[in-house]
């Protein structure tokens, strides 16, 4: 005869269900939960529990990586379970790129999740405590820092995905007992035992040895990940303050950077180089930026490429420049174009957007009636800047204005019949002294620079 008192497992299960309900209150009332279900024991239990606790607010998706002959049948298996439980269901095949199979499959999977998530939906995944511990161990072996050792968070905003992992504190043994008790069917993926994959090797080879020596290892390492998440949050706050003091997303003032301790310099560089990407650069890449760019000779044209950007030093400032933008500096244009201007017209050029506006001193309105030439800079030109004495080499004026070397190719000369009227630059229009200058004239006024243009074109 069964005891009237609840068993330990039943008590724990009730507590877990209650915790699930409490966590769900962090999301808006109209939230729908998209369950990523592979058909494995963990995700099948999660799908069952979520559909019980949140009826009519759950749907499921199976990502078919098409890497195994059985993958399609697994999708049908999950589909049948979902239909029996009246859960809306989607099968999404993906193509996994070559390379590191585990990483590429993960990238394809999350891209598929993102494409299916609606604005009011949260992605719910069945990662458990052993998954978390394996992640920490593998990242430790790959040399990860504080953020990497924080591993997975229970609730995390990842690009455009809000991800919830409610089972991170649940052990695999607890999941096994619960699935057995509820008699939930599931699939056994044999690749989980293939030790050619790092995670399977960790699980099948390393785990038993460590578990035997350290029985509480799983709970301890899982706790460490939480402490690392706390440390990473504090570090992020400090580094954001340092970044605000030393620069912004695109540049760092090296004189201010070097006032920090060496440890904070290294951390800030890593944080800054990451930009809006998911991961920070490798330790070695940060060291290379310090040694090959920051510490290079003053007259050296040092530049280092990483993750679609070049890191370049100019006038004791370290810049982060998009690859295609930086490489354009070597392009020399011979194209001469003709333009006609009128008052208030906008002109989009390589150096920015200019608007024709009235000025106390400017060019004659008579020029509106004539075709003007836009000439590329060839080198050797001289300019008599309005308000200054004598002719100056245009190159010297550009250097004096500290126009960044990789933007100088955008400079164009406005001319009429071989008379220089002015120069379009990323820092504005430079009026040249000529017979066409007069009081109450007009000038092109820079209203958005080349950086703004780049952002607009990529948005």
Curated annotation (Swiss-Prot):
BP GO annotations: tRNA modification
EC numbers on record: 6.3.4.19
Gene Ontology terms: cellular component: cytoplasm
Entry superkingdom: Bacteria
Pfam families: ATP_bind_3 (PF01171), TilS (PF09179), TilS_C (PF11734)
Amino-acid positions noted as binding ATP in the UniProt annotation, renumbered to this chain: 38-43
SUPFAM superfamilies, alphabetized: Adenine nucleotide alpha hydrolases-like, MesJ substrate recognition domain-like, PheT/TilS domain
Gene Ontology terms for molecular function: ATP binding; tRNA(Ile)-lysidine synthase activity
Gene3D superfamilies (alphabetical): 1.20.59.20, HUPs
UniProt entry tagged with the keyword tRNA processing: yes
CDD domains named among the record's database cross-references: TilS_N (cd01992)
Keywords: ATP-binding, Cytoplasm, Ligase, Nucleotide-binding, tRNA processing
Catalytic activity: cytidine(34) in tRNA(Ile2) + L-lysine + ATP = lysidine(34) in tRNA(Ile2) + AMP + diphosphate + H(+)
Localisation per UniProt entry: Cytoplasm
Family as reported in the entry's similarity comment: Belongs to the tRNA(Ile)-lysidine synthase family.
Domain remark in the UniProt entry: The N-terminal region contains the highly conserved SGGXDS motif, predicted to be a P-loop motif involved in ATP binding.
Function: Ligates lysine onto the cytidine present at position 34 of the AUA codon-specific tRNA(Ile) that contains the anticodon CAU, in an ATP-dependent manner. Cytidine is converted to lysidine, thus changing the amino acid specificity of the tRNA from methionine to isoleucine.
Name used for this protein in its record: tRNA(Ile)-lysidine synthase
Species of origin: Acinetobacter baylyi (strain ATCC 33305 / BD413 / ADP1)
């Amino acid at each position: 005869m069964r005891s009237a008192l609840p068993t330990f497992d039943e008590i724990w299960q009730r507590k877990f269900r209650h915790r699930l309900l409490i966590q769900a209150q962090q999301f808006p009332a109209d939230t729908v939960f998209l369950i990523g279900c592979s058909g494995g024991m963990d995700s099948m239990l999660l799908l069952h529990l979520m559909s019980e606790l949140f009826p009519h607010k759950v749907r499921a998706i199976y990502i078919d990586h098409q890497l195994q002959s059985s993958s399609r049948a697994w999708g049908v298996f999950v589909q049948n379970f979902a239909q029996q439980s009246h859960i809306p269901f989607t099968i999404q095949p993906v193509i996994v790129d070559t390379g590191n199979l585990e990483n590429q499959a993960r990238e394809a999977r999350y891209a598929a999740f993102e494409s299916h998530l609606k604005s009011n939906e949260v992605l719910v995944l069945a990662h458990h405590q052993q998954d978390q511990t394996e992640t920490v161990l593998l990242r430790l072996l790959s040399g990860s820092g504080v953020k990497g050792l924080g591993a997975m968070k229970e609730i995390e905003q990842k690009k455009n995905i809000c991800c919830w992992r409610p089972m991170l504190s649940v052990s695999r043994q607890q999941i096994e007992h619960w699935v057995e008790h509820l008699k939930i069917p599931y699939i056994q993926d044999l690749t989980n035992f293939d030790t050619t994959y790092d995670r399977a090797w960790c699980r099948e080879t390393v785990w038993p040895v460590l578990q035997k020596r350290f029985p509480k290892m799983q709970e301890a390492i899982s706790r460490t990940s939480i402490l690392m998440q706390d440390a990473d949050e504090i570090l992020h706050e400090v580094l954001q303050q340092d970044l605000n003091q030393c620069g912004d997303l695109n540049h760092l003032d090296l004189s201010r950077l070097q006032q920090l301790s060496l440890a904070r310099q290294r951390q800030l560089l890593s944080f800054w180089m990451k930009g809006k990407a998911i991961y920070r650069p490798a330790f070695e890449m940060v060291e290379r930026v310090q040694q090959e760019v920051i510490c290079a000779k003053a007259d050296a044209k040092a530049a280092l490429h990483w993750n679609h950007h070049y890191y370049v030093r100019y006038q004791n400032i370290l810049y982060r420049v998009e690859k295609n933008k930086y490489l354009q500096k070597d392009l020399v244009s011979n194209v001469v174009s003709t333009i006609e201007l009128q008052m208030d017209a906008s002109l989009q050029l390589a150096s920015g957007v200019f608007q024709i506006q009235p000025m106390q001193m400017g060019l004659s309105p008579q020029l509106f009636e004539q075709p003007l030439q836009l000439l590329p800079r060839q080198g050797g030109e001289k300019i008599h800047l309005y308000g200054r004495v004598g002719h100056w080499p245009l190159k010297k004026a550009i250097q004096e204005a500290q126009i960044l070397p990789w933007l100088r190719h955008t400079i164009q000369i406005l001319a009429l019949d071989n008379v220089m009227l002015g120069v379009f630059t990323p820092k504005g229009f430079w009026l040249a002294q000529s017979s066409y200058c007069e009081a109450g004239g007009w000038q092109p006024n820079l209203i958005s620079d080349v950086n703004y243009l780049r952002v607009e074109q990529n948005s």
